C-alpha cells in the first residue's frame, strides 16, 4: 500500500492528468483559453504572441492580434470541449479542443494563424504544409516563429 501511495504522489507531481473539460471559453491569446476556471494551452501549436507583428507585401500587420481575435470569433458563446492528459510548467492543461465538430488546433494551423509546434508534437505538420502551400495567413508574407519572437528575434526593420 505504501508503494502505491508513493506512486500516486509521484504521478500527481509529474503533471500527468486526464481531463475532459467543456463549456464556453474565455480567450487569453491565440493558443490559450480558460474553461470553467481551467487554463488550457492548445496542444501541438503555437500562435504569434498578442502584440507580435508580421509583414505581407511590405505592410506590417498585427498577426498575434489576428490569431487571438479569430479564435474569439470562432468560439464566441459556443460550447468548447478540450481533451488533455498533461499540464505544463504553468499549470495549464495541454489539450486538443473541439467546437462544432472540428479540431480548433488543426483549424488554426490550417488557416495559417498558428504553426505546428514541432518541439512538442508532430500532429499538425500536415495542416501547416497545406497552409504554407496555399500561402494562407502567416505564410502569405514574412514572420518570426513565435518561439523565436519570445526570445527577442524580430523582423528585419530595413525591409
Model-derived regions: residue spans:
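Small beta-barrel nucleic-acid-binding modules, primarily SNase/OB-fold domains
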Residues: 2-5, 13-159
Amino acid at each position: 500500500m505504501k508503494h502505491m501511495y508513493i506512486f500516486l504522489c509521484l504521478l500527481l507531481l509529474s503533471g500527468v492528468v486526464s481531463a475532459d473539460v467543456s463549456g464556453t471559453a474565455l480567450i487569453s491569446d491565440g493558443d490559450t483559453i480558460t474553461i470553467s476556471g481551467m487554463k488550457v494551452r492548445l496542444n501541438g501549436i503555437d500562435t504569434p504572441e498578442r502584440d507580435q507583428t508580421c509583414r505581407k507585401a511590405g505592410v506590417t500587420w498585427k498577426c498575434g492580434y489576428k490569431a487571438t481575435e479569430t479564435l474569439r470569433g470562432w468560439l464566441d458563446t459556443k460550447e468548447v470541449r478540450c481533451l488533455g492528459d498533461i499540464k505544463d510548467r504553468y499549470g495549464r492543461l495541454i489539450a486538443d479542443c473541439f467546437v462544432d465538430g472540428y479540431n480548433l488546433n488543426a483549424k488554426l494551423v490550417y488557416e495559417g494563424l498558428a504553426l505546428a509546434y514541432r518541439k512538442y508534437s508532430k500532429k499538425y505538420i500536415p495542416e501547416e504544409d497545406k497552409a504554407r502551400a496555399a500561402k494562407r495567413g502567416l505564410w502569405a508574407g514574412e514572420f518570426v516563429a513565435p518561439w523565436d519572437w519570445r526570445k527577442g528575434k524580430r523582423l528585419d526593420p530595413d525591409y
